[in-house]
Amino acid sequence: MSRYRGPRLRIVRRLGDLPGLTRKSARRAYPPGQHGQNRKKRSEYAIRLEEKQKLRFNYGLTEKQLLRYVRKARRVTGSTGQVLLQLLEMRLDNTVFRLGIAPTIPAARQLVNHGHVTVNGRVVNIASYQCRPGEVIAVRDRAQSRKLVEANLQYPGLANLPSHLEFDKNKLVGKVNSVIEREWVALQVNELLVVEYYSRQA
C-alpha cells in the first residue's frame, strides 16, 4: 500500500486531529461520505484499525513501513507501544517537524529529500533516518535552504518544542538531547491498540 497523497482534511474528519499531517482543522465533526453520520457501534477490530491508521497517516508511512517499525519495536526491551512511538518520533522528518523547521511532516520530508537538512554537518536526505541523542540537526548553510525555513518558522506546526530537543532560531541549528518521552508525543493515539492490531502479523 503506497503513501497517502489524497485530501488531508478527509482523513482528519475520519480519524481526528493529526498534527503531523495538516495544520487545518475539519469544519465538520463527523466522517466524510454518505454514511458519515451513522452512529453504529464499532467492533474492537474497527477501533484498533482506526488507531493504526492514525499512526500511519500522521507519520506518512506505508503499511509495510509501519509493520516494519512494529517488528523492530518488539525486539527492543520495554513497552512495545512506547518504543514504537519513540522510533516514529525520532525519524529525521518528524524531528525536523518538531523543531518547527517545517509546518507538517510531509513538508519536513520534502525538505529532507531535497537536501536542505544536515545531521552533524553532513547532508542527510533520508527521511526515515533515526536521530540519536547528541546529534545536531541544522538547516543547510545556503541561501535557498535558509529562505525556505525562515518562511516556515513564521507559521510553526506545533507551538511547543518538546523537552528532548533544543533549537536556535537565529542559527537555524537544533540538537537532540535525549529520546522523546511519551508525554511529549503530540498525536492522541492509543499505541497499545496498534500493537494489538499487529499481534498476529508482527
Curated annotation (Swiss-Prot):
Residues 22-43 are annotated as: Disordered. The keyword Nucleotidyltransferase does not apply. SUPFAM superfamilies: Alpha-L RNA-binding motif. One of its GO terms (cellular component) is small ribosomal subunit. Residues 90-152 form the S4 RNA-binding domain. One of its GO terms (biological process) is translation. Pfam families: Ribosomal_S4 (PF00163), S4 (PF01479). GO terms for molecular function: rRNA binding; structural constituent of ribosome. It comes from the Bacteria. Signal peptide: none annotated. Keywords: Ribonucleoprotein, Ribosomal protein, RNA-binding, rRNA-binding. The keyword RNA-binding applies. Belongs to the universal ribosomal protein uS4 family. One of the primary rRNA binding proteins, it binds directly to 16S rRNA where it nucleates assembly of the body of the 30S subunit. With S5 and S12 plays an important role in translational accuracy. Part of the 30S ribosomal subunit. Contacts protein S5. The interaction surface between S4 and S5 is involved in control of translational fidelity. This is Small ribosomal subunit protein uS4. The gene is rpsD.
